[in-house]
């Protein structure tokens, strides 16, 4: 990708569409099928997804087994949602969604675009099947099993050991979602934002947009977003 070329920034509505398309696989009717994990296996998608943008638009998707009559009811409620100005604000019709779907639980959180100017200030390294053997994984030993599926993968290394890593955990041809892990005893040192910035650069070099989302009660993850001044475009909400 030509990094000197001016980036065409999608609208917040387009970003939300890229986000939901990265999170889940869809059938031809754009109904949700499964969680779009890059590694083998297929976890079932939620019954309902609602994306509320900072411009006041709402995007909703439904799992393939939600009856059409119920879909119509839910779509009517979605069209009446508020602007997602507050990261922690719950959907206006949360109780109605839960009751209509007989939901067992819901998830909710902010969604960000990592801007093109984000860049690491410390040295980070790319990890793949060939290079991962050069480093001690320690508490991140599980990374060896998934390394082939989560490219690009960027790490911060101290004394030969990987202490923080950001990799692609949801992938489409247009956008990647970040998956961030830092060894507990190394948290609070700014390493997380370094690997996120390095990962975002690698994703852009592959011709895709780097997206970052988390849950509203994950204060550590939200802190990373704040320190990197990520671009908040909306909030997601799912019901299982």
How would you name each of these model-derived features?
Residues 178, 188-202, 223-227:
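Conserved acetyl-CoA-binding loop-helix of GNAT-fold acetyltransferases
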Residues 212-223, 238-240:
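Conserved beta-strand-loop-alpha-helix junction that forms the acyl-donor binding cleft
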């Amino acid at each position: 990708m030509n990094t000197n070329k001016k980036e065409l920034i999608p609208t917040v509505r387009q970003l939300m569409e890229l986000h939901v398309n990265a999170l889940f696989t869809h059938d031809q009717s754009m109904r949700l099928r499964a969680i779009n994990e890059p590694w083998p296996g297929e976890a079932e998608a939620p019954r309902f997804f609602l994306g509320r943008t900072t411009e006041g638009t709402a995007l909703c998707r439904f799992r393939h087994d939600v009856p059409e009559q119920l879909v119509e009811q839910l779509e009517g409620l979605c069209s009446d949602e508020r602007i997602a100005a507050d990261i922690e604000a719950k959907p206006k019709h949360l109780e109605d969604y839960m009751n209509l779907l007989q939901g067992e639980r819901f998830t909710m959180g902010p969604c960000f675009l990592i801007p093109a100017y984000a860049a690491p200030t410390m040295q980070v390294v790319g990890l793949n099947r060939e290079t991962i053997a050069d480093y001690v994984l320690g508490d991140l030993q599980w990374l060896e099993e998934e390394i082939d599926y989560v490219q690009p993968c960027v790490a911060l290394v101290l004394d030969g050991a990987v202490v923080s890593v950001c990799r692609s955990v949801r992938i489409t041809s247009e956008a990647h979602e970040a998956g961030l892990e830092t060894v507990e005893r190394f948290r609070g040192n700014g390493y997380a934002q370094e690997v996120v910035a390095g990962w975002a650069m690698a994703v852009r070099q592959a011709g895709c947009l780097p997206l970052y989302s988390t849950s509203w009660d994950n204060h550590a993850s939200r802190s990373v977003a704040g320190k990197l001044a990520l671009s908040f475009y909306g909030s997601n909400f799912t019901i299982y």
